[in-house]
Structure formats: structure tokens, C-alpha cells
Amino acid sequence: MSKKSQDLTETQVSSRNVFDGELLHVYQDKARLPDGKVKVREYITHPGAVVIIPLLDNGELILERQHRYPLHRDFYELPAGKIDQNEDPLSCAKRELLEETGYVADSWRYLATLHPCIGYSNEKLIYYLATGLAFREANLDDGEHLEVFTLPLITALEWVNAGKITDNKSVSGLFWAEKVLNSNW
């Protein structure tokens, strides 16, 4: 970039809360664009979530099968969960791993923060690699039903390629895991 970067900032003119749900909040704002025009911007606020890549000593990953109501089908996923208000993301990751899978980890490594839907949400996903796993006991949240199983990373990646794993957060996490475990990152 040899030229000076253009200011692309959009400035909020007004904001209207359209919907307040238990998890999501929808807003419709008017924003002033860099050229001075005012346009409507609609977006969803989300508290953020953690995604855990739990790696067993034998090299297999812990995954979950869970029904997702919006798409009316089961999905294969990495363990994950919503960050509670004022909760530290690593504390959330530890809590979610234990609640959903029954495992605790001796070692935690931050991998990345990704924004899965930047065009309409402020949601962020914070990824951790969990190793040194030991089983305790799962304690699912009320209304949460899932099946926990293990799978080699190579098989999980084959499932991605075959379209059997399509969940965005899990696909991203599996690709991160492959890079990290192959010492490429």
C-alpha cells in the first residue's frame, strides 16, 4: 500500500433495539458512511463463546453430537459454550469442557479469536487447545442434550471434507488443531 489508507469508519447516528431475547439482541441503526450518506445497519449482539479443542493423550479429539433446532438436525461439533456476563473466557472454557464432556485439562493454550459473522453480528469465538485430559463427570445445563465421543483428528478432517462436519466453529477449530499439532503454527 503506497497510498495513504482511506478512512472507512461508519459512525452511529441513531440506534433502535428491535428485539431482546434470552441470548440475542437485534438492533437497527442508522450509520453515517465515509461519503456522508446515512444508511441502515442491522445487527445482532452476542455475548461471545469459547471453543475447546480437547486432545486426549492417545491423539484423539473429544467431539459432540448435538441437535441444533434452527436447522432441525444433528451436528458434530467441538465442545463450546457462551461466555457469561463478566466471565473470563478461559474460566468459561474450563467450565464448558467439564459440563459438556466430563473432562478437565491440565494444560490450556489460547489459539485464536475469530469473528464468524462480521456482516451482521459482533459475536466472537475464542479458541483453546486443552491437553492433559482426565475424566471426572459431565453435568449438562438444563435443556442441553448431547452425545460425547472421540475421533482421531485425521478422521474429523475427513468428515469435514465429506460434509459430515459443517459447523463453522468446529471446522475452523479442526483446521487450527491440524496446524498446531503439525507444528506449522
Predicted segments, located by residue:
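Acidic, metal-coordinating catalytic segment for phosphate/diphosphate chemistry
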Residues: 10, 14-51, 57
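Hydrophobic residues on conserved beta-strands that form the core of alpha/beta folds
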Residues: 26-28, 40, 64, 78, ...
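Long hydrophobic alpha-helical segments typical of transmembrane helices together
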Residues: 157-185
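A glycine-rich, hydrophobic loop/mini-helix early in the fold
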Residues: 49-73, 77
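Unchanged
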Residues: 39, 48-51, 56, 82-168
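Basic/polar N-terminal segments that are highly enriched at the extreme N-terminus
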Residues: 1-8, 185
